[in-house]
């Protein structure tokens, strides 16, 4: 649980170095990024997610009605049997939100078998008044004022990026 939390924080902040030890064993060591933050974020995601993520990911960057979505989505050929490599952030905060995970699943529905999951890291920035982060004590769940807008933004951005990368729905 601690390792997962540190990984999520490290993804959100590539400009910060992270190190985690378990006794004498180095569990995680990530240097701080320099230069372009888009490249830095992709390098950080690749270091954490493995599976040659950077070589098999497409950039996501779009906005709609005050919402801004960025990040990287794995190509359909890069997938897993569980959703453990799906990372979602709202205003820089790691979240585990059913609406967001459902939007990702919906976007990949025509590209992946039902039991497969995309590797993804998405960063959604919304105006503070458009989201309630006090739904859960750990603040890992959120409630959006316009959940349809959020879902539509994610689904359309992912489908558009996958199509632009040459992937067509089956």
Identify the meaning behind each predicted range.
Residues 1-170:
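N-terminal phosphate-binding caps/lids of nucleotide- and nucleic-acid-binding domains
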